[in-house]
């Protein structure tokens, strides 16, 4: 038998073995997968990511979701929980509240040690869910409805995952994806002396953890790959989970189609990696932000699907974890992690290069113009005197724009941050609370791998944007260049070295089965939040119209590939977020228009868009579009709108709605 034939036979045997049902009692783990809606306010709330005062929500393209994975070791009953969210960041406020809720509902089961929360870093979701002022500047303060929707949804996703615990097996695989990201700060990257293998500026590694049930069926997967979720530009006003959210949607909705299947596309060291392959907003590979979102998402899906379908390495062994809060203010760093000299971190400050934004993904302006920002004015302004000389020296090459760590009565950026590590058999997963550049993450990954090999660790996955958010982390060499990422590295030139020290120490603790010390406590600032974004006083319909009336009816007929556009008199979307529901339905009533109505699309589907606009002082218009996708059954359809309106006199919020006349889908264009 030839070598190629033998290899093919061996691969076939492996795949057959993986797909064969196994006795539940023989399986090493139980796992549960769950998903819940975390979509915030869909109108008149600043979006989180681009820091633009002008970018406010005005509808929904697709909803935001939390995807939870609960893993339980069969032998010990020990559990780990990983949640990936379609959010710009996991802010510490969210982490603290979620953990408080879990501890209250499941005492002794879930705590900071075994729950990791992560974000995809979409820039097209409503903001205002941080307790630190720096991240609420362009949103005009704290947005309680959005915050509660996020917390409630994350908790609900974990509850659903726990309710679905089943025996199963885990498999790890990896591969390279080289056409879905590009380094937006290549000159800074090239200053690193250790870029062998990374000369083109990207980290191509994708890691996939597959969840296989007792029948040998794939129940879900987590894919880690570094690329910013900025395919949608700062000109977009529709809520969107961006490219990673589309990858999840495509696998779950278009490919698997199995109830309960959950696919998460998580981040790693994406700090300087853009999906805009032409290095300008909304460009690359196409010149349309929606096409780019789908294409970059499809490329991530295709690689993850390929890896999950290959013969993978089975994950076997114990579950373990470590977690600690660390005060980053003046944290000492040992010489082996620096330039051979003892160093320390600085009080947090942002640099002038941050104000320009990232021109490749979307420039600022951060909402820093005090005359245009009542929230900033109420905080006392951006600059409060000349920064102390000690801070200027500590921050080295950075020209300080604002010393955010010295703001009173509370700092504008975190001082205490979470560091976390999971052990899942021979895999270690690191949870880091910031955006790490390619080499900042690679250095930590390599160092942890070296520290963990003696414990049988074969794979290290680095997950940024986890448990909290403290802007960027660059290498020492990149920091000196003071591009956007360097100006956004809060704690000074040795920030990456500090994280590397903390993760190596934690890896050693896991290896030696030692506890880690938490000497700091993350402050709860929920008492002290402000909001200058106006709410809903009341809703009025158009003169001579009623809520739910159709302002624009569909044509009599369309063909597949056409776009149907209709409009309704509606209320303000802030009245009801319609969590786990929808603002629209596309309904199929059959070829004769008389069959039982069947919903074929909602506001979570790629082919629909729900756009809201204010008309006059208190009226609202909802414009709904449906791009008829290939595979749509010919027949009669109508579009229904759901909304809510607030009465001025009683302040009561009531559900409203309306439906268009029916229209016919004829098939493809001749």
UniProtKB/Swiss-Prot annotation:
Changing residue 435 to A: Slight ceramidase activity. Zn(2+) binds at residues 121, 228, 435, 472. Binds 1 zinc ion per subunit. One of its GO terms (molecular function) is metal ion binding. Its EC number is 3.5.1.23. GO terms for cellular component: extracellular region; membrane. Changing residue 184 to A: No ceramidase activity; when associated. Disulfide bonds join 346-394. Mg(2+) binds at residues 61, 603, 605, 608. InterPro entries: Ceramidase_alk, NCDase_C_sf, NEUT/ALK_ceramidase_C, NEUT/ALK_ceramidase_N. Pfam families: Ceramidase_alk (PF04734), Ceramidse_alk_C (PF17048). Changing residue 665 to D: Abolishes enzyme activity. Residues 644-670 are annotated as: Required for correct folding and localization. It catalyses: an N-acylsphing-4-enine + H2O = sphing-4-enine + a fatty acid. The keyword Signal applies. Catalyzes the cleavage of the N-acyl linkage of the ceramides (Cers) to yield sphingosine (Sph) and free fatty acid at an optimal pH of 8-9. Also catalyzes the synthesis of Cers from Sph and fatty acid. Alternate N-termini have been proposed by different authors. It either starts from Asp-25 or from Leu-27. This is Neutral ceramidase.
């Amino acid at each position: 038998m030839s070598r190629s034939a033998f290899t093919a036979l061996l691969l076939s045997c492996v795949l057959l073995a993986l797909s064969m049902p196994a006795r539940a009692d023989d399986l090493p783990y139980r796992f549960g997968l769950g998903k819940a809606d975390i979509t915030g306010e869909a109108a008149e709330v600043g979006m989180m990511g681009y820091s633009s005062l002008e970018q406010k929500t005005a509808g929904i393209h697709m909803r935001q979701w939390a995807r939870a994975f609960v893993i339980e070791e069969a032998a010990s009953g020990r559990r780990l929980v990983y949640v990936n969210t379609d959010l710009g960041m996991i802010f510490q406020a969210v982490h603290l509240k979620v953990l408080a809720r879990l501890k209250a509902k499941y005492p002794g089961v879930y705590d900071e040690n075994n729950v990791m929360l992560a974000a995809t870093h979409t820039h097209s979701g409503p903001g205002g869910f941080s307790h630190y002022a720096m991240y609420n500047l362009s949103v005009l303060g704290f947005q309680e409805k959005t915050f509660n929707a996020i917390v409630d949804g994350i908790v609900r996703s974990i509850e659903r995952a726990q309710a679905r615990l089943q025996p199963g097996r885990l498999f790890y695989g990896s591969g390279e994806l080289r056409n879905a990201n590009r380094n937006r700060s290549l000159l800074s990257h090239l200053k690193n002396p250790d870029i062998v293998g990374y000369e083109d500026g990207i980290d191509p590694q994708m890691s996939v953890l597959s969840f296989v049930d007792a029948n040998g069926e794939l129940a879900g997967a987590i894919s880690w790959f570094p690329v910013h979720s900025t395919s949608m530009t700062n000109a977009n006003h529709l809520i969107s989970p961006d490219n990673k959210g589309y990858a999840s949607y495509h696998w779950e909705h278009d490919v698997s189609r199995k109830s309960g299947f959950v696919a998460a596309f998580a981040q790693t060291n994406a700090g300087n990696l853009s999906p805009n392959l032409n290095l300008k907003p909304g460009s690359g590979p196409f010149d349309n932000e929606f096409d780019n979102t789908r294409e970059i998402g499809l490329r991530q899906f295709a690689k993850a699907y390929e890896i999950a379908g290959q013969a993978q390495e089975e994950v076997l062994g114990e579950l373990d974890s470590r977690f600690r809060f660390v005060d980053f203010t003046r944290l000492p760093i040992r010489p082996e992690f620096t330039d051979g000299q003892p160093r320390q971190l600085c009080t947090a400050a942002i640099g002038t290069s941050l104000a320009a934004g990232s021109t490749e993904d979307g420039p600022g302006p951060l909402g820093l113009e005090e005359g245009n920002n009542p929230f900033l004015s109420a905080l006392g302004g951006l600059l409060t005197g000349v920064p102390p000389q000690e801070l200027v020296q500590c921050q080295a090459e950075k020209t300080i724009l604002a010393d955010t760590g010295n703001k009173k009565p509370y700092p504008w950026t975190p001082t205490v941050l979470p560091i976390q590590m999971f052990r899942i058999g021979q895999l270690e997963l690191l949870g880091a609370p910031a955006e790490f550049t390619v080499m900042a993450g690679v250095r930590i990954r390599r160092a942890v791998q070296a520290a963990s090999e003696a414990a049988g660790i074969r794979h290290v996955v680095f997950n940024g944007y986890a448990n909290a958010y403290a802007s960027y982390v660059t290498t020492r060499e990149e920091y000196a260049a003071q591009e956007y990422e360097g100006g956004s590295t809060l704690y000074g030139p040795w920030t990456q070295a500090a994280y590397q020290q903390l993760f190596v120490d934690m890896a050693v603790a896991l290896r030696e089965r030692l506890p880690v010390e938490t000497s700091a406590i993350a402050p709860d600032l929920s008492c002290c939040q402000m909001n200058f974004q106006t709410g809903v006083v009341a809703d009025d319909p158009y003169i001579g119209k009623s809520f739910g009336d159709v302002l624009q009816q569909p044509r009599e007929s369309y063909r597949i590939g056409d776009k149907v556009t209709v409009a309704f008199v509606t209320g303000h979307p802030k009245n009801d977020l319609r969590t786990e529901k929808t603002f629209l339905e596309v309904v199929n009533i059959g070829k004769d228009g008389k069959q039982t109505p069947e919903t074929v699309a909602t506001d979570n589907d790629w082919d629909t868009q729900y756009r809201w606009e204010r008309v006059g002082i208190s009226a609202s218009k909802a414009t709904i579009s449906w791009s008829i996708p290939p595979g749509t059954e010919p027949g009669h359809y109508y579009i229904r709108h759901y909304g809510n309106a607030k009465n001025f006199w009683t302040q009561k919020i009531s559900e409203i709605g309306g439906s268009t006349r029916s229209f016919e889908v004829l098939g493809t264009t001749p």
